[in-house]
Regions:
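ADP-ribose/NAD+-binding catalytic cleft of ART/PARP-like enzymes
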Residues: 1-43, 58-59
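Conserved NAD+-utilizing ADP-ribose enzyme module
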Residues: 2-5, 36-44, 50-159
């Protein structure tokens, strides 16, 4: 299965010493009325880009200390392709409201990962991304054009 041009997936965490990731329902499952994320399937979420990972984290002001947060970048290895739920399935089944933006995929078993490095994410918006959510709970939250905004925060790789 071709993931991206590098065949690489990424996962971000605040923990610097992970070697394995265990499937679970994310602690920040989108519970807003205008959003939807599956709350039943235990999974490890990956994205084919760092930006997709940042968008998928749904960072809030509480995540930043002095205007920044350090996140550790992991990449999985030795994945069983049969246990990957690809982005097309997530989007097609409307499992995550913004999967069409994050391009996330899921792994349904424990995943071995290697640490690639760390990034610092700043609470400054680099780009506002307007998108059509896959599923909407309450249309009153939509803009008049039927879309939502999400924010990509600035980040840099640490030395």
């Amino acid at each position: 299965m071709k993931i991206n041009e590098l065949d690489t997936l990424f996962h971000l965490s605040k923990s610097p010493d992970i070697t394995k990731l265990t499937p679970k329902v994310p602690s920040k499952v989108a519970s807003r009325e205008n959003a939807f994320e599956d709350s039943t399937i235990e999974r490890v979420s990956f994205a084919p880009s760092i930006k997709g990972c940042i968008l998928g984290l749904q960072l809030s002001k509480d995540d930043f200390i002095n205007g920044e947060v350090v996140l550790y970048v992991y990449s999985p290895y030795d994945l069983d392709e049969q246990k990957i739920v690809n982005n097309e399935v997530i989007v097609g089944k409307k499992l995550v409201f913004d999967a069409n933006v994050t391009k996330e995929c899921w792994y349904l078993r424990e995943a071995s990962v290697e640490l690639l490095g760390s990034i610092t994410v700043y609470d400054k918006v680099e780009q506002t991304i307007e998108y059509t959510p896959i599923r909407v709970g309450n249309p009153k939250f939509l803009k008049p054009n039927g879309k939502l905004d999400t924010y990509l925060y600035k980040y840099k790789w640490n030395q």
